[in-house]
Amino acid sequence: MKRKIEQSIDTITGVLSKWNDVDTIVLLESGEDFYDPYFFISVDCYCTGAIPPSHTRRDLFPGAVAFESLHASRKDRFLMRDIPFRIEYKDQSYFDSLLHTGEAPEGAFRDTGTYMLYRLRHGRVVFKRSDWIDEARKDLDALNQDFWNMLRTAFQARMEHFLGDLHAAIAREDQLFYLISSSGFIRTACSVLFVINHRFEPSGRLLAAETRELRTLPDSFLGRFDSFLRTNPSLKPSQKGEVANLLARSIVAL
């Protein structure tokens, strides 16, 4: 299976690298192996210009089946040799601006935290036309404290916003909004902790495990974290709200 995966990667890389405006191709594997339910291969294609339209791309990958293209976000998804691939075409100038100015466009980290920077920093490079990726990674390693402070302020405010929503949902006994606000709260709480540790966030699939391994965590964090995540009918929503309060206060105090 490993060989089949690498052959498929080579095929896809061979197609993408022929496009003049593709500068760098980076891979991340999700899941421990092919039989892991989380398994798929994510391909980040950093571009300096236009890419072929979706109907053209569909015909360029030999053997690809179940091809789907998301026009709004410039993403392709398909199977090749039964292996799930997801390709995202990214504007290289966007990252240049972010890294050189140290300022992020509004909403840049809203939904996935710093995961896009994690991908840029830790993905496996399978093609590069220039030294752009090497320089970008140097810039990521040299981000100053002002950048991290900016992120902490933004993520902390969002965490507190979700905490307020969580308590409102508990008071109204709104089960759907309770789930939405619980998810938003714990996700942004993790975002704050990664920023405090000057680390970029992994994917949601790895977030719980890597959060537990962070060097700087509040006292009693792990027990509260596990209590908040645990599905336990005996833990009332109001009690979970109190756990969320304790988590938030301890994180803000770091």
Predicted feature locations:
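Residue-identity detector for threonine
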Residues: T11-T13, T24, T48, T56, ...
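Short N-terminal helix-initiation segments at or just after the protein's N-terminus
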Residues: W19-E32, G123-W132, A171-R172
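Hydrophobic transmembrane alpha-helix bundles
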Residues: S54-S69, H100-Y118, A208-L222, L235-R249
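Generic hydrophobic secondary-structure signal
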Residues: L27, V43-C45, M80, F85-I87, ...
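Conserved NTP/Mg2+-binding pocket subregion across the NTase superfamily
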Residues: K4, G63-I170
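Conserved nucleotidyltransferase catalytic core and NTase-mimicking acidic/glycine-rich helix/loop elements
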Residues: E6, D10, D131-L254
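Metal-dependent nucleotidyltransferase catalytic core
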Residues: M1-F109
